[in-house]
Amino acid sequence: MTGNLLNRARHIAALFGVLLLPIHPALAETVEAKLPNGIIATADFRTGQPARPAVLLLHGFLQTRHSPPMSSLANTLADQGYTVLTPTLTLGINRRTKSLACEAVHTHTLEGDIAEISYWVNWLANKGYGSITLIGHSFGSTQIIYYLAQKPNPAVKKTILTSLVPLLSKPKEVQKALAQVKQARTSERAWERFTLSYCNGNYVAPHAAYLSYVTNDHNKTLDLLGKTKAPVEVILGGADTAMESIWPEKIRARGIPVTVIDKAGHFFDDAQEFDLSDKVESILKTLPAGKK
């Protein structure tokens, strides 16, 4: 059964409450890694066919590998024979399994997130995968852009960024935090409440940790998009209220191909989930084998 037909069959089965099992289920192995900072990170790994590229999927802001749409996309790709790695960023927590609340104390930084992405990409490459595709969702897409802007592993042949949108923050809060840090009037133990993404005035973090995310604004993100060291494609939802209407054109102006899926929201719910997986699979089929 082809990927498109299997996806459509699942959708029809879901409408009638039927559980449609994959023909060749790929069992996930949970792997652990002790990072240089001593934190234990985890990921689910499923081995696929050597002729297909390996895929690393990264979840959105404060979420885990079990969060949609990356969790369902990972299942679909594994069923289609792709090697799939889905890490959960630790955000400074050993073996993190739950989404992190806005009200939690956030000492993690963008730099730490990038280091973890690098670790897992290298982990895949060290297992012999010479063709790796990175797929991110929402802020996970932004984190991947910053990873690509550094020294990405040469095994990364393609990047697919879904629901790539600017990370919402308040300019006055940013300027105040910058002033506090510049005047050395803060410490790692001095926490404050900020607005960041969907955390509206209740994102608790030290100034420096907060600034690591917000000083990388959408203008810098767009600038880096045009300088990535691996080919990038962007997939957006036509009904995504988290982006302004001119956002797709701003991305295209950087020379990046953009696909807008009609009626899809930020999480590609309902039938648009299958439109997303169809588009992703069509891209993956053009790439070299994961292992030779």
Model features per residue range: what roles?
Residues L91-H108:
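Cap/lid segment of the alpha/beta-hydrolase catalytic domain
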Residues L27-G48:
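N-terminal cap/lid segment of alpha/beta-hydrolase-fold proteins
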Residues P50-A51, V55-G92:
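Short, surface-exposed "cap/lid" segments of acyl-processing enzymes
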Residues A104-K127:
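Alpha/beta-hydrolase active-site loop
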Residues G136-G140, I144:
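Gly/Ala-rich beta-loop-alpha elbow adjacent to hydrolase catalytic centers
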Residues V105-H108, P154-I283, L287:
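The alpha/beta-hydrolase serine catalytic core
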Residues T2-A13:
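Bacterial N-terminal signal peptides that target proteins for export
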Residues L134-G136, T162:
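Short beta-strand immediately N-terminal to the catalytic nucleophile in serine-hydrolase-like folds
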